[in-house]
Amino acid sequence: MTNQPMLHMLQKSSLHTLLLLTAKVLSRTGFGEVQILDRRQERQKSRFGGHELMCESSFGSLPLKVIVKVINDGIRVRMLDELAGAVIRTKADLGIIVSPCHVTATARKLQPHYQAARVNIIDGAELVDQLQRLGIAVRPSGEPDYSFFGAMEEVGRRVNSFLRMEAV
């Protein structure tokens, strides 16, 4: 059963907080070095063709590249199409779309068609499970760590303020 308070916290979090949480989950689950690329605003377009995080690792001499799209909206077919195109264009080994929200029925039904492009989905329930399993943003009692989320939102505000000053 999904931790509803945690799911609610994720759904009301900023994109910046979701990017940082997703990067932390990927790093702790062995995806190697995780880079947050240039998109930090909800309506901003990614200059990297549909993804915001890049994970690079290697197993022996075999390099591995995973691209991740983080959104704060329901996962729709269009988003799967964009990520599949990005996986193919960047020659990535895997693409992951992460959202604290739901997956539309059509996207869920068509997801098997994206296996050739190696596109996976992490929805809100799965993200909550990963965070709880790894002990990220959750208290020992299982409830969300509200102070952690508050600190992440503050970091996001400061980064956005800095980026606005840099753009001037």
Label for each model-derived stretch:
Residues 1-168:
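Mixed-charge (Asp/Glu-Lys/Arg
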